[in-house]
Structures are given as C-alpha cells and as structure tokens.
Amino acid sequence: MGLTVVYAKETWHVLGAVQSTGGASGVPDAGPLVGASLELRGIRALPGPAESGAAPIAVPVDELAAAAVDAASDLDGFPAVLTTPFAFGVTVVNEQPKSALVPLNDGWGPSPVAATTRRITVTLPQPVAEGSPALVLVAVGAGPPRSLPALVTGPQLTIDTNLSAGVYPVLTLVRGVAARIDAVQVSA
C-alpha cells in the first residue's frame, strides 16, 4: 500500500494524507490530489458567528507539495498520519522530501493566537528554534486566505496585518511544531 501526504512547502507540515491500495506510482504533484486548494477543517474553538458554519481554510495549491512516505502505524495498525496529519512533518533534505515522517511538538497553550485589526500575535510552545519559518493563514471570506510568512525570533510571533473586527479561521504553521487551526476573535 502506498501512502502520500500533502504538505506545506515552507514549513513541511503534513496537512493531509491518502493511502492507495495500488503499488507506488511515483510522487504526484499536489494539484491533482487537491485541485486549486486543500480545504482544512478542525477549528478548536468557535466563538460567535463562526459557530453557525465558519468557512474552512483553503490552502492554495501553490503553498503545497506532495510526497510518498513510509506508513508508520499507531497501536491499531493504521497509519497515524491518516487520522492526525497535523501531528507530523515531512523530512526534507536538500529541498527534497524523504520517506520518513517526523512527529511534531504539540505543546500549544489553550489560546495561543490573539489578534487585533492591525496585528496577529502567536505565543509559541517551547522550544522552537530561532529562525524557524512560520506561516499564518487567515481565511478572509470566499477568496484565498491571507498568507502571512514570518521567522521565529523569540517566544512569540508578531505579524502586522489589516483585518476587520470579527471571527476568522486561522491556520498556524511553525516548523517543528504541530499545525493548529483556531477561530480567532479580531478586536479593534
């Protein structure tokens, strides 16, 4: 059985996985697997209007890549990456994905993302290596999410942005740390 993951190019986070019953047929491009974007759901807390059907975050295909990986199994003999993809990262060497997945640190606090109309602040679990790439994606209506890249320079990421007050789905990707989706209340 083959196992293919779709991952974030910049931070190497696994965002989705599929298992095929056929033999390995090479590594596909992410596009044929996800189309124009990969819709992610899994918001941990939905305050306010988002409870009635917040849009998922649709990660654009140009932010994604695909890789054939080893199917390490959990206790039930089922590849754990199929049930908890956000908990894994792809091993990348010389810009090429390898077949081994790595488990990621999930030491997030209960509400690590705070936002105002001018800035998003993410409190990071520790330790996170200085200079690690990060990507925060904010779903803003029906269009593509706002992509906010950053580098880790301390215990928090602070990213300038321009948002209206309201509740937004936010995907946080920091290399080495489990991916996370939250509904974030943006205050004035």
Locations of the language-model features?
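Solvent-exposed serine/threonine-rich low-complexity stretches and specific carbohydrate-binding patches
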Residues: 140-158
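Long, contiguous interaction/targeting segments characteristic
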Residues: 1-97
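Solvent-exposed strand-loop boundary residues in beta-sheet-rich modules
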Residues: 9, 140-142, 176-178
